[in-house]
Amino acid sequence: MAMKTARNPLPADARIDRSSLIPEQAYRILRHAIITLKMPPGAVIVEKDITDHLGISRTPVRDAIRQLADERLVNIRPQSGTYVALIDRHQLEEGRLIRRALEVEGIKLALERIDDAAVERLRDLLVLQERAASKARHEDFISYDDQFHQTISELSGYSRLWRIINRSKAQLDRVRYMSSPLPHQEEKAIAQHSAIVEAMAKRNLDKTVKALTHHLDDAYERTSVLLKQHAEMFTQV
C-alpha cells in the first residue's frame, strides 16, 4: 500500500496546556489523531509538522511515538521512517476478548453498588447519544458511547479498570471511526444501551450480563463488514 504523509493531521484546536505535563498531552493528542483516523493507517508521521503545530520540542513527541509503538499503533522503521500502523486483525480479536471479559466482570460488581443516581447518569448519557445520532455527529456519539461504558466500569469500584479496557480496545476504536455508521447502527446501539440500563435499574444480574454481552458481540460482528470495505487499512491474515 502506498504510504501517505500525515501532514497537518492534528485538529486546528489541538493545543498544549503549559500548566500540565507536556509529554502526556502530546501522547494523548497523537493517540486521539490515530484512533480517529485523522492520521490514517499507513501514513508517514512527520515529527517536525507535529512539533510546529503544538509548539513543543521533539523530545516529548518522540516519547509519545515510542509509547504508541508499544501499543502497536505506530511502526518505527530505522533508516526508513515512522508510520501509523495498519489495524492488526489479531489485536482486534485480542481486544474483543479482553474487553468482553473485563466489562462483564465489571458490570457484575457495578450491579452491587449501583444506586438510583447512577441509573439516571446512564439514562442522561442515552439522551446525549440520541441527540448526537439525530444530528449525525458520529464522533460525539462515540464519545458518549465510551462515557456510558466508562461510567459502568467506574461503578465497579476499581479505578484502573476502564484504563485497561480503553487501552486494550484501541484497534477496535479505529474501526469505529472508519466511516459513517452502518444503517441503523446507532439506533441499535442506543436500544442495546437502554436494555443494559433497564436491567441494571432492576438489579437483574442475568438480564444485565446478557444485555451487555449481546451489545459487545453485535458491535464486534460489524467489524467484518468494515474489514471488507477497507481491507487496505488492515494487516493481512
What positions do the PLM features span?
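Short linear motifs at protein or domain termini
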Residues: 1-112, 117, 220, 224-237
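C-terminal regulatory/effector modules of DNA-binding transcriptional regulators
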Residues: 2, 182-237
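Short helix-capping and inter-helix turn/linker motifs at the boundaries of alpha-helical repeat units
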Residues: 21, 119-120, 184-187
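Short, surface-exposed helix/turn micro-motifs that flank interaction/cofactor sites
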Residues: 35, 62, 69, 153, ...
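Mobile beta-alpha loop/short-helix "lid" or hinge segments that flank ligand
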Residues: 69-75, 168-170, 185-187
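Alpha-helix N-cap/N′ positions at the starts of helices
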Residues: 79, 102, 124, 188-191
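Conserved amphipathic alpha-helical segments that form helical-bundle/coiled-coil interaction surfaces
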Residues: 95, 107, 112-178, 191-199, ...
